[in-house]
Amino acid sequence: MSDTDGKKTLGLRGGAPRPGNVKQSFSHGRTKNVVVETKRKRVVVPKAGATTSAGGKAPIGDPSRRPAGISDAEMERRLKAVKAAKAREAEEEAARIAEEKARAEERERRRAEQEERERAEREREESLKAKAEEDKRRKDEAEAAAKAAAAPAAEPVVQRPAAKAAPEPAPRKQQDRDRDNKRGGKGNDDSRRSGKLTLNQALAGGEGGRQRSMAAMKRKQERARQKAMGGQVEREKVVRDVQVPEAIVVSELANRMSEKVGEVVKALMNNGMMVTQNQAIDADTAELIVQEFGHRIVRVSDADVEDVIKEVEDDEADLKTRPPVVTIMGHVDHGKTSLLDAIRKAKVVAGEAGGITQHIGAYQVKTDSGQLLSFLDTPGHAAFTSMRSRGAQVTDIVVLVVAADDAVMPQTIEAINHAKAAEVPMIVAINKIDRPAADPTKVRTDLLQHEVIVEQMSGDVQDVEVSAITGQGLDDLLEAIALQAEILELKANPNRAAQGAVIEAQLDVGRGPVATVLVQNGTLRQGDIFVVGEQYGKVRALINDQGERVKEAGPSVPVEVLGLNGTPEAGDVLNVTSTEAQAREIASYRANAAKDKRAAAGAATTLEQLMANAKADEDVSELPILVKADVQGSAEAIVQAMEKIGNDEVRVRVLHSGVGAITETDVGLAEASGAPIMGFNVRANASARNTANQKGVELRYYSIIYDLVDDVKAAASGLLSAEIRENFIGYATIKEVFKVTGVGKVAGCLVTEGVARRSAGVRLLRDNVVIHEGTLKTLKRFKDEVAEVQSGQECGMAFENYDDIRADDVIEIFEREEITRTLT
């Protein structure tokens, strides 16, 4: 016994909980010892004799009830497994019953809470209603007391009981506390609100781990509240008024509708528009999308900024007579500029390259009678269609010049159409009347075909026979112009803000952007702030047609305007504004509107059109070029002429067109695209020339548009594939077929027509049907290889890689010729 003094013998522990310490680690090196209690589940197993007594079954060792081949140990093991399974089923059933009971209690608790809330809400509403009635009663009593003019009334008797009944919120707070206490640990939002800590929590990090945020708890409470109130209420669709301008970006449209960008893009694709969120669409497409999403569209326009330059009707008393604007039009080389020279007594033709007018010239002439006439001389070449159109739009009278020895030509017809479209009166000047081959009657007769009936043909169109060389009929022409101007009663108000049209624009090296403007109304003065197209500026200087500086220009006066911030387009309208801010805002709006429209036009392409264009471009060769010209009108005319060059196989693509000298930027663009640079009346600066020489960029200079168009047409013709043409040179008939070792079958032939050549192509005809086409392997005459065999001679022929030849077959000999094609 001495060995066991003070020691406990080994044995099994009871079912009491075993305490233990767990070391819990947190961030920043903090630790905490946590006491953890673990409880062992007690497995309830029936007693050993219970099964036998209850079921009346035989004992384990009863050989009569035991299956054959089963030992006692195996039988005992099976019985224990059955007992354990039954015990587990009993535990699971008990757990299920407990869980259902807990769920029922939870439902009951929530129902009680809901009823409590409804009761509290009813009490609050009743309290508010009673308070309102009490206030109304007091007000009525006060009014009655005031009417009776009695002494100051004492406090209402019912005020004290009301004061006693007032503290209503106190029981409600107590009820809320009681309800919170009833919820217990299971109804709490998070386990961190309880004081217990389980083993899993301690091992997983416990309180030091990631906790649920207050926002998550609030969301959970909100979901529970909505669930208790009968489920989430479906949010109603908000119908908005969506403002849509002329062009809008897809993402901006989605933002204004408060819709997802992806949904808007999907709707556009369903309507056949392959666009992204950064592309712009037009207003009509945007309206369809807005209506599809159930919103209301409000069409707006950014053009409100242009209200300050809207045309104002002038009073009749302010209008004064102005000089007429006369445009001289006609076919090339019919003497338009020479006629104007004779009127102005100057030499304009000498200043034009090749004697061809390539700009719109604006001049003012004073007649012998003292009357002022403003003349516009338009080009007659086919490339300057847009210039003639602009000249017809700003003019009052059109003088149609027709050569008496050439009659009506294509540009003459075009000028007639421009005049009719602009609805301006016409005067026919039959020029070159001094020529021996002049036939003015033929001119008048030809004009009848185009609905131009002159006075000598009982019409209302004046016609004058003139000669720019001898001066014959010039006075009659000026008299006819003055008469027509008197009939039109041309008037304008000089005492208002100026308005005019840009006839021509160019980028001058020393003076910057220069615009030739024909003032149509008002007076343009030095220092005026103006907007013209997408550009704006302040009038720095005004130069008239004589090259002299002037302070102002009235109606129908052509002047050159200096002081623009950029080169405007020919045909733009000039308007004077009161402030520079207005001019800048209008110019910015116009530039953005033009850019948005170009983007919207490019985006409005369906997938089928994209695929069709891509397939068409595969078979078309392109000649890229860059165009730089001295004035905007010439650049525009060259671009239009380039667009007309080409066919289904080749076309000319103008990568860039601009005004001014050729710069290094142009050379860089030309090098990247492998394009030549065409300079029309401009030259490259020194740095651009050096860069072009280093990078191998071709620079071409022109002063006559004929030469430029012809050179580009010749270069484009070089991209055309050559035409293959077959020329038949002879026929031969096979008389007999021989077999030669090392060669194969050889045809003994008689050349019946033409000549047979070794280098030519051959076809084998059998019963007039082509059965083979190829080349000759050998051509022999008397065992000698020959280059050709003349008609009537015999020879031997062997085909390359073909042996199926028979007697009486016919051999057709031909040669292929490549013919260079040109563009017409």
Swiss-Prot record:
Q: Name one GO cellular component term.
A: cytosol
- Stretches assigned to coiled coil: none
> Region entry G5: which residue ranges?
467-469
According to the record, the residues making up region (Disordered) are 1-32, 45-232
Q: Give the Gene Ontology MF terms in alphabetical order.
A: GTP binding; GTPase activity; translation initiation factor activity
Specify where the region named G2 lies, as residue ranges: 355-359
Q: Where in the cell is it found?
A: Cytoplasm
Q: Does the keyword Isomerase apply?
A: no
| InterPro entries recorded | EF-G-like_DII, IF2_assoc_dom_bac, IF2_II, IF2_N, P-loop_NTPase, Small_GTP-bd, T_Tr_GTP-bd_dom, TF_IF2_bacterial-like
Region (G3) spans which residues?
Answer: 377-380
A Pfam match: IF2_assoc
Q: Where is this region: G1?
A: 330-337
The tr-type G domain extends over 321-489
Q: Where is this region: G4?
A: 431-434
Binding annotation for GTP: 330-337, 377-381, 431-434
PANTHER family tied to this protein: TR-TYPE G DOMAIN-CONTAINING PROTEIN (PTHR43381:SF5), TRANSLATION INITIATION FACTOR IF-2-RELATED (PTHR43381)
Task performed by this protein: One of the essential components for the initiation of protein synthesis. Protects formylmethionyl-tRNA from spontaneous hydrolysis and promotes its binding to the 30S ribosomal subunits. Also involved in the hydrolysis of GTP during the formation of the 70S ribosomal complex.
Family recorded in the similarity comment: Belongs to the TRAFAC class translation factor GTPase superfamily. Classic translation factor GTPase family. IF-2 subfamily.
**Name used for this protein in its record:** Translation initiation factor IF-2
Source organism (scientific name): Roseobacter denitrificans (strain ATCC 33942 / OCh 114)
Its lineage reads: Bacteria, Pseudomonadati, Pseudomonadota, Alphaproteobacteria, Rhodobacterales
